A protein has these predicted regions:
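Conserved donor NDP-sugar-binding/catalytic core segment of glycosyltransferases
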Residues: 99-132
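Short aromatic/hydrophobic "clamp" motif used to bind/position activated sugar donors
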Residues: 87
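Short, well-formed alpha-helical segments that are part of the catalytic scaffolds
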Residues: 15-29
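C-terminal subregions of glycosyltransferases and related glycan-biosynthesis enzymes
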Residues: 196-314
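Acidic helix N-cap motif at the loop->helix transition within catalytic regions
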Residues: 21, 46-54, 95, 99
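A conserved acidic beta->alpha catalytic loop
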Residues: 26, 41-50, 67, 91
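Conserved nucleotide-sugar donor-binding catalytic segment
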Residues: 132-216
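Glycine-rich, basic loop-to-helix element that forms the pyrophosphate-binding segment
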Residues: 65-82
Length: 314
């Protein structure tokens, strides 16, 4: 590995000892030699740190947060200590496929300086890939990114980003939507969509609709509603006008999510007011009627509706 490697793989982790070992193994078996791995432990309370230290490889750097700050803050910490020209984000429960960094290196050598992000594909546990539908070969500016994101069923992709861009656009601290970063990035920089599958998403969480999991979900939704509302409001403030023109479906979803967050946060009067205004504009939005109906009954019924919807989608 050179003093300034080509890639820094940044892996945020919280209470995932088994999964982080799998993610690290997927990095260390890469044939491309010019990379480092920065693991950011977001104040885990189990053996996650010990799991990382069981890999005494000089390419791995372990950083630790004193307090749990969320995945975006952990990624920012990793980027701040990265030396690579390109940043590769990898979730702790996912893994790079064999040869992934070789593919990234080849693609990085082919792109002009005007391209600041390479978007690679994920392999999903349920089959198929994302993003879907395929947009391989397209170079997306701000408006192109909005139109693309508005039309896809699966929008997640593996990010390979020039480190220099983080001086202009950083991930939002706290627990607001990561989507803010992608929109802010798209307004400043261009993304090349690529056909190569470089990583696998693993679904390690059991999707069992137990009473305990439902109650945890409800508590989490209510506790995080104010922060989620902040994220939605930030997106609408920064990008609402462009979204309404280039991504009307996404814009409509954000308006409904704002209503949902208001109701879950206990701001019932404002939530119902915005809800009726939303339905006046979109009377055929069945999910809008469902949100308003459940929210009128209280925070718990609305959170339960979200729980059932999440299990149905899974």
């Amino acid at each position: 590995m050179s003093s300034c490697p080509q890639f820094t793989v940044v892996i945020p982790v919280f209470n995932r000892p088994r999964q982080i070992e799998r993610a690290l193994r997927s990095c260390l078996v890469q044939r491309h030699p010019d990379f480092e791995v920065v693991v950011v432990d977001d104040a885990s309370t189990d053996d996650t740190t010990g799991a990382v230290r069981r890999y005494p490889d000089n390419r791995i750097t372990l950083l630790q947060h004193a307090n749990n700050r969320g995945v975006c803050a952990a990624r920012n910490t990793g980027v701040s200590q990265a030396r690579g020209e390109w940043i590769v984000f990898l979730d702790s429960d996912d893994e790079l496929l064999p040869g992934a960094l070789e593919i990234m290196a080849r693609r990085a050598s082919e792109v002009p300086a005007s391209i600041h992000r390479l978007a690679f594909k994920y392999l999903h546990p349920s089959g198929g890939c994302s993003p879907w539908p395929d947009a391989a070969g397209e170079v997306l500016d701000y408006h192109g990114y909005l139109r693309w994101a508005d039309s896809v069923e699966r929008s997640d992709f593996n990010n390979c980003i020039r480190r220099s861009t983080f001086g202009n656009v950083r991930l939002p601290e706290g627990r607001v939507y990561e989507r803010i970063y992608h929109l802010d990035f798209a307004r400043e920089f261009r993304t090349l969509m690529l056909p190569d599958i470089v990583a696998r998403i693993n679904d390690d969480a059991a999707n069992r609709s137990t009473r305990a999991s439902c109650l945890r979900y409800i508590r989490r939704q209510k506790a995080g509603a104010a922060t989620a509302l902040e994220g939605v409001e930030t997106i609408l403030e920064r990008h609402g006008e462009a979204l309404s023109q280039d991504a009307p479906n996404t814009y409509r979803r954000l308006l409904r999510q704002r209503i949902e967050c208001l109701l879950l946060a206990g701001q019932t009067t404002e939530g119902l007011r915005r809800g009726w205004s939303f339905l006046a504009c979109y009377p055929g939005a069945a999910n809008g009627w469902a949100t308003l109906g459940a929210g009128a009954l209280g925070r718990n019924p609305l959170a339960m509706l979200k729980f059932l919807h999440s299990r149905w989608r899974a």
